[in-house]
């Protein structure tokens, strides 16, 4: 597994075990606690890392929850669908929590958590917008038509996923994707992207019925 990039040196912990000593980093410690952290843009590398961890944790204990923490600006729709499909494939419930931000692709993963187990910290920010091509398309008319058709397919798939997990109507989701829709934690809860706002581990969470 490739470590997420960091601007600082990650600390390492040395623990004494029955077999001797073991050195690990924060991400390894989180994995031991069944926590997967998505803290980078959603791309092929991060998708492979997250899906591998989800499948490993399912194999380790298929009857225990997995916690997916999200702080990501979003990214590739294709990479996002790899994580999304794996979340739905594994037998474990996947609880999702947004801390910081969940950009468009990451917002889908946040919403795709097990119903009742989707949360946001008070300062979280969630963004929705329609998919776009990552770079200009060049070529003959037939090539442009292929890319246009794929963009329409991706847009339809994104709308379908958001409708499924938020309870919004197709018309509402389609309208909200026409422009950048920026939501704070309370608005994300009202939209149906999360179920509750969690101020802290010792503080009772604010559920969807709270104002």
From Swiss-Prot:
Pfam families: CLP_protease. Gene3D superfamilies: 2-enoyl-CoA Hydratase, Chain A, domain 1. Residues 1-24 are annotated as: Disordered. One of its GO terms (biological process) is protein quality control for misfolded or incompletely synthesized proteins. The active site is at 129. One of its GO terms (cellular component) is cytoplasm. CDD domains: S14_ClpP_2. One of its GO terms (molecular function) is ATP-dependent peptidase activity. PANTHER family: ATP-DEPENDENT CLP PROTEASE PROTEOLYTIC SUBUNIT (PTHR10381), ATP-DEPENDENT CLP PROTEASE PROTEOLYTIC SUBUNIT-LIKE-RELATED (PTHR10381:SF26). Has lost one of the conserved residue (Ser) proposed to be part of the active site. Therefore it could be inactive. Belongs to the peptidase S14 family. This is Putative ATP-dependent Clp protease proteolytic subunit-like. It comes from Streptomyces coelicolor (strain ATCC BAA-471 / A3(2) / M145).
